[in-house]
Amino acid sequence: MADFAQLEVYIGDLSTAITSLITQCQRNGHATGSPSENLSRLFGLEAPTEAHRARESALVILTKLQIMLAGPTDLLQQMTIQTQLLACIRWLGEFQVPACIPLDGSALMKDVSELIDVPENQLGRIVRMAATCGFLREPEPGHITHSALSASFVTNPSYLDAAMFLAETAAPAALDMVAATKQRLGSSEPASQNVVFDQGFFSAANKTQLRRLQRQWQAYLRHGMAHLCDITTDFLTCLEPLRMGNASIVEVGARSAERAMALVDQYPTLHFTVQLSPASTLSSASKNGTAASKVRHPRIRVQHRVPGTPQPIQDAMVYIINFPVPEPGVSYNSPVAQISAELRAHLAPLRMNRSATIVLTAPSLPERGNVAAVGVARIRDLSLLQLANEQEVEMSDLLSLLNGVGDGEGRLVLVNEMRSAGNHGAVALEVKYQSYTDR
């Protein structure tokens, strides 16, 4: 009986969420056009916060219903469908099929097959499989059109980069987890050629493919692992220095200038220095981000700084330290060691200017009951294990680390913890220098 009662609750919650979603579509002027076109405008970070929450709520409830109702055969079929869909999107991306189809209108299957030099029959079989999941359409035999979903992979190439990384790197690393575990435990069983231990797959990245791999990894971080703490801005807007005239902000370990561009547009007197992460100096940002090396803004300056070295800018009001992640082709220490080194590198400027603040941004663990967010957090954790032999840092470990950073005159103390209101899975820790005599 308890299961039936819970099912009724989920059905009621789903009805409420769908009603809210329809209201958001109408409120934001999306009442015209096809339903898929209307809903597609609720994708991505640019969607209004209320619309994003309504869509997320509906998806969370659908996930709960699927968990409750699915049996073993359903699970196996779902895995099979997702495997085939991934294979199809990789194939379509490799042969650049989405780019061959006009965003408005249709293309003949025959013309596309001749353009990419593959048999029309094979192209048709792959398109039809992808179409079962809403990626591309075959409105009539022999014709291909974009769906709202597939069109987004053309207008925003970082989605395709993320999918290619998943197919070519993340999925093989995940499937090699058994062999990796056995070898770490001392088994004599030979591992596949793709398995790299100690520092993970990234430590042996193919240098000839490094730029492509780094670009794809940045896209996968954002879209596949929901690692958004390095671009989220909403939890920074409550910082008092941002509203001060001519305030100087330094962003440490940035992977793009996206956050800087957003904040200088929001605060017209803000001056921003972007200190790039090592990998971002080697790869260009995707279209979804902002290539820091190409930024031309009078209030944004781009620098290259070796992580953990003394901070050359001593007079900033805020130092935003981005949470470190492993990068292909870049030597890598553990996140805790890197964060500790960065905090110690910023002791001097905070000691000299007691008004200055460090803001450490990091991924946050979701609240209990948020099935979708918990799933994404587990994806991040296992992906770090499989790709770099790392794991997500717990908040308790970060707080313990903060409490241990100091010098002969004082130490760093946590003064505020800010969570993103936009469901971005991000937290910001506001840290100041406190003299031992001030306690």
UniProtKB/Swiss-Prot annotation:
- Which cysteines pair up through disulfides? They are none
UniProt-listed Gene3D superfamilies: Vaccinia Virus protein VP39, Winged helix-like DNA-binding domain superfamily/Winged helix DNA-binding domain
- Xref: InterPro entries: SAM-dependent_MTases_sf (IPR029063), WH-like_DNA-bd_sf (IPR036388), WH_DNA-bd_sf (IPR036390)
- Name the UniProt key words of this record, in alphabetical order: DNA-binding, Nucleus, Transcription, Transcription regulation
Write down the superkingdom of origin: Eukaryota
Q: Where are the transmembrane segments?
A: none
Q: Name one GO cellular component term.
A: nucleus
Q: Which residues form a coiled coil?
A: none
Where in the cell?
Nucleus
The HTH iclR-type domain is annotated at: 79-149
Q: For this UniProt entry, what is the primary localization, expressed as one broad class? A: nucleus
**One annotated GO molecular function:** DNA binding
DNA-binding residues per UniProt? 109-128
Q: What is the purpose of this protein?
A: Transcriptional coactivator; part of the gene cluster that mediates the biosynthesis of agnestins, dihydroxy-xanthone metabolites.
Tell me the protein's name. Agnestins biosynthesis cluster transcriptional coactivator AgnL9
Q: Which organism is it from?
A: Paecilomyces divaricatus
**What gene does the UniProt entry assign to this protein?**
AgnL9
